[in-house]
Amino acid sequence: MKKLGRIHPNRQVLAFILMVFLSQVRLEPIRYSVLEETESGSFVAHLAKDLGLGIGELASRSARVLSDDDKQRLQLDRQTGDLLLREKLDREELCGPIEPCVLHFQVFLEMPVQFFQGELLIQDINDHSPIFPEREVLLKILENSQPGTLFPLLIAEDLDVGSNGLQKYTISPNSHFHILTRNHSEGKKYPDLVQDKPLDREEQPEFSLTLVALDGGSPPRSGTVMVRILIMDINDNAPEFVHTPYGVQVLENSPLDSPIVRVLARDIDAGNFGSVSYGLFQASDEIKQTFSINEVTGEILLKKKLDFEKIKSYHVEIEATDGGGLSGKGTVVIEVVDVNDNPPELIISSLTSSIPENAPETVVSIFRIRDRDSGENGKMICSIPDNLPFILKPTLKNFYTLVTERPLDRETSAEYNITIAVTDLGTPRLKTQQNITVQVSDVNDNAPAFTQTSYTLFVRENNSPALHIGSVSATDRDSGTNAQVTYSLLPPQDPHLPLASLVSINADNGHLFALRSLDYEALQAFEFRVGASDRGSPALSSEALVRVLVLDTNDNSPFVLYPLQNGSAPCTELVPRAAEPGYLVTKVVAVDGDSGQNAWLSYQLLKATEPGLFGVWAHNGEVRTARLLSERDAAKHRLVVLVKDNGEPPRSATATLHVLLVDGFSQPYLPLPEAAPAQAQADSLTVYLVVALASVSSLFLFSVLLFVAVRLCRRSRAASVGRCSVPEGPFPGHLVDVSGTGTLSQSYQYEVCLTGDSGTGEFKFLKPIFPNLLVQDTGREVKENPKFRNSLVFS
């Protein structure tokens, strides 16, 4: 059918699609026949074989039979492929007098879409007898009527058609009349009574005859009516209609009691024989219910609403009768003019309420449209909104399929309300709309998406195991199981990272937990990837990076690297009494395993044998003289340096230093024990003797050890090795503190030469031998620093 109206540009591609679609429609219909009144469930044909389809294909492709009208009178057995009757078929009810009686149907298959046209011819059986509308007919004939005159009689009706329909009329045997069966222009057979010889009222004033209507069935059926013939006195002229037939057109929406037409008949006789009255002649019940005629004026009035869609024209026979009983016949042909009073109809044959989002060209609905009006009033345009991903495909006989134009996206729109509009081309235009709701079923086409591509989590060290340290979150735009997200830890890229023992993740909610207590000093940070997978088929997944930064806590106290805190052999620093204020005695070197401000170290002098003599620089731990030394200052000093970090709460450590004041580096010295209490000096002479004896013995042993050490040093030509002046207790020459105060500023070396004279028993230190002390500066020449010549500094 040619589609009228505006064609949207977006629909121009439909022409090609339509050509492809129509190629799936079988144009030549398959034809079957069945006798009317056949029992329901009766076999009609083996449809699958006739269509060249396998029996299993009918079920797999959802084959079904669609009829042109609203009733489904046929059914398809998908298991056997047989076409069966759903109900008894009454040809007279379905088609009336129309012959042949054909029931049109379509066979629809999906995947791919195919249409097959079918026609079922309903064959008539002789199940109706001819019936006359009245039981008796009164016929008045003038006695001067001539032989050969025809007198119309009542028509019998037979609902059967063809050979089973009305074929002829007969009348009971008599000598004055016989029946002539004639064919009307409408195809009906009319009986006319033919006069065979003159009549004589005085001889026989009345005849009673039986009119028989016979059909052509086997055996034939018949109907009868009694015909009474009255012989009338002479009335020379019968009424004659001025115009016959009359033709008139009436709008189907004309109001009741509207005048249709006025007929006029004249009788040239005088008196009562010239008086004419009008009436309906041999009118059917339908005509009697629809029209009436004024007996005096001959005006035909409308008694019942007209309906063009049911009856398009009426043939009304009018009889004009004079006072003498003569009558004339006239015909009025009333044509009903169609008006656009029927909106289009939309009949849905198949509807799919849910379709998958990834299936283009999916059939959503199959429907047909019709308009009971005619002409332009019956032409229709079917459309849907342009902004929907659906298209209408016309098939045949006003059948349409609604299919998806492209793959749908449930996440964009999970439901579509489609309004199918059918508009006729009448004036005014009438429209019918049908709303269809289509649910889009989800397909797993969206992977879970993390809210962030990377997450940074902070965990303070020494945490409790199973501590919740953070969460990751991913969402999936799908629905149902396709949107259920499961979290997991992915294998780390670093094979040495024991991820399985560090963290775990809750698979349901993405919460991350620390499995053990973390130690900043062992592991400052680590990163890993987490995965989020949905439960679709196949499952989709995504990844995100998680960085875990371990926050330091002040859980490490400062550790003193130098001087070594060895209680058995403490280090002793030598300071010449001639040292200037600010003289560097030594440097306390400490480290802290923490970081940040927890590792910022500060130094302070906690205890001193003589307060005010020495000072400690707070930032670098350098111990320097605070003033000039004097002879009154004690020779031995004990300093306790406190090293404290900047944590909260702060942690600390102490370093004990022994300082020995010497007049010159040539005099012997030994680390002396702690000063005796004041009360222990009572007997000074005894103490001096004991000390002298111990000193001589110790010096001897010490001298031997020094001699051996010097020999070894000379052989190995070791450069500078910072050592305490006491045996044992070596320490490294360069130390680094984490607070940024640097290392020991210098490296120093010295030699001690020991000579002994057995005759005198006197030890003498030789003048110390020093290498040139060099001061190096980046980018400068190396120069000798004379300031340190012939001086000894211990660090």
Swiss-Prot record:
Keywords: Calcium, Cell adhesion, Cell membrane, Glycoprotein, Membrane, Repeat, Signal, Transmembrane, Transmembrane helix. Residues 28-689 are extracellular. The chain crosses the membrane at residues 690-710. It comes from the Eukaryota. Residues 711-795 are cytoplasmic. Its main location: membrane. It is found in: Cell membrane. Residues 1-27 form the signal peptide. GO terms for cellular component: membrane; plasma membrane; synapse. Glycans are attached at residues 183, 417, 435, 566. Residues 34-132, 137-241, 246-346, 351-450, 455-560, 567-670 form the Cadherin domain. GO terms for molecular function: calcium ion binding. SUPFAM superfamilies: Cadherin-like. Potential calcium-dependent cell-adhesion protein. May be involved in the establishment and maintenance of specific neuronal connections in the brain. This is Protocadherin beta-4. It comes from Homo sapiens (Human). The gene is PCDHB4.
